[in-house]
Amino acid sequence: MVVPELQAANFGGDYDNFTYPRYALDFALVRVYEHGKPIQSPYNLKWKTKGSVPREPVFVAGFPGSTNRLNTYSQFVFNRDIFYPFMLRRINSMLMTARRYSERGPEQSRRALDDILNDENAKKSLIGEYKGLMDKTIETKCRQNENELRQRIASDPELAGLHGNAWETIDRVVQKQAVIFKEYTATFSTPLADIAFSIIRYALEKESISPTSAGTDKSADKKTPEKPLAADKTVKKELLEELRAQSLSPTAIALDYEEVRLAGELEFLLSELSAGDPFVRSMLGEGSILRAPADVARDAIRGTHLTDIAFRKTLLDGGRKAIERSTDPMIVFMRKLVPLWLEREEYHRNNIQAPLAVALEKIALARFAVYGKSAYPDANFSLRLSVGTVQGYSMNGTLAPSQTTLYGLFDRALSFATSDVASDFILPARLAANREAPQRDRIPLATPVNFVTTCDIVGGNSGSPLINRNLEFVGLVFDGNIESLSGRFVYNEEAGRTLCVHPTFIIEALRKLYNAGNTADELEGIKSIPLAPETKPSDSKPSEKNLDKVPEKRSGTVDEAKPPRNMVRAP
């Protein structure tokens, strides 16, 4: 229904991302239809335009993605010394590739914008989390918590017999994980590479269900993997549907950008792995020499027909035999790599993930036996309710207020107007024009824009409603401040804050910027939901595309449900 323009939702760009004070109109409204009519549900939150007041108790209801607060100390060290440094190098490489491509011209800049916003967001998030790992106070707390639990278990013979060896198991597995980490993460992702992988995987899984339906060409490439990844038939059927949908997705693909991205991915992996690594040899090897990543990417992209959905369908319908006989350069290229991917994933699943899961379950059971419900579990995308208060905090030797206003937004725009980064702080066009409107149609400069609470959130909470004790909607969660990023490992109530869009700003924008007064009336309960749509949902095309800051999507906290492209979350 309503989506603000990018400059309104992303005001301040990467400079203001994960910061506060903040001035973002970051929201989206959609209407849910049932049987062709707007759904009329009795289950809803009453909208409170005035929002909340300082020190008022508030609650965030949402699905936080994941945290690592209950990790063992050896896992903490692995993340600090291996995982995060590697992922930061990787995101820097991805960001550099996208930026270089965007400098080629306006159209290239447009194509790369989503990836740049995504990667900038991911990088800033990773840096904030990494700083938490480097914080000696957090490290000490992690070690102390583990020692206390182990002592409590050791003092109970029954618990010690059931769970006492779990830490030693994790220590051994993490040491093994550190050795193979780079090899396991030797993957890459581009639109065409993903399509090729899905097509090849589809053929393998389909044949594993009906061995006689595809057949194999004995003279074909013997490197096509024999083992499918999924074992359960029900899982396989669901996987087949997903792989086929991914393979036939009508995604727009710019071949020149695809080539640059693939070359960048291969270049990074070459820099991280040894020249003799089997994956590197399969990617770049030609006899006894290694080809340049740019040359390999060029040959794989420029002759491919995978941009043609009909061609993809032919490969899917042809099964494994069609894959093995295909001369399409991208299929040939990926056909060499899929066996190694599946082999390494199987090894990791059996030798890292499985023993870790068993040992961590033992520790979780022991923790519950010792602490009961007083120690809540790590975030895992399940529904959680976080309580806090609307409250400012100390920062940079001064105080951050609990809320910002439109005065501050205009001041920030004017303050950067003549700087080198002015483009990130340009006033959104509609908001600038609103200052010239008749007085009654202007948004008052004292209008609250964003505000902060002490609620405990992590990636995945973006878009969660903020409610008060009366179950009234008083804000929309869209980000956390930079101090909150260490919350992946420990909650920081002193300075970690949840950032929310104020409901007053949303209502004022609907009425005075977007000509959506009827929608504002619905939210405020002034009028009821229409019984029939004014226009079909699929017919509406926003005049301006709202590109969220991160993958694939949002502004603010990294969305765990859809992590940044080709990123792996901390183990």
Language model feature labels by segment:
Residues M1-P571:
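Terminal presequence/propeptide segments associated with secretion/organelle targeting
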